[in-house]
């Protein structure tokens, strides 16, 4: 197991890599355990609001197993907590994609599985 200092160094290094991929015009949404959780309907409204506000270039940022660096959290325009549980990175990507798909179904008043 890594020490607290080593974990911080790992998060900072991951954070630098993440921030290097984020463009200035992106609306950044960080997946953060300390943020507010949303229902699917609230998430749909959030996505819709971003479109209305002209934020069509949204970057969802998923941290590693240690979470996100403070620099990434500071860069985020918004933070969301999907769950207090830990998920494998690849699985969470699918879960996030499914929620984005569901959000657009809700916006269009189309049926979706509850």
Protein language model annotation of sequence segments:
Residues 63:
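Rossmann-fold NAD(P)-binding glycine/threonine-rich loop
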Residues 35, 66-68:
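Conserved nucleotide-binding/hydrolysis micro-motifs of P-loop NTPases
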Residues 70-114:
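Structured adenosyl-cofactor binding patch, chiefly the S-adenosyl-L-methionine
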Residues 1-56:
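S-adenosyl-L-methionine/SAH cofactor-binding core of RNA-modifying enzymes
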């Amino acid at each position: 197991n890594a020490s607290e200092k080593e974990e911080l160094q790992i998060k900072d290094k991951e954070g630098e890599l993440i921030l290097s991929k984020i463009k200035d015009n992106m609306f950044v949404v960080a997946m953060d355990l300390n943020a507010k959780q949303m229902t699917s309907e609230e998430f749909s409204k959030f996505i819709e609001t971003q479109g209305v506000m002209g934020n069509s270039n949204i970057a969802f940022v998923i941290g590693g197993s240690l979470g996100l660096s403070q620099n990434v959290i500071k860069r985020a325009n918004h933070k969301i907590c999907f769950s207090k549980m830990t998920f494998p990175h690849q699985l969470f990507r699918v879960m996030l994609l499914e929620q984005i798909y569901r959000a657009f179904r809700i916006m269009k008043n189309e049926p979706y599985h509850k």
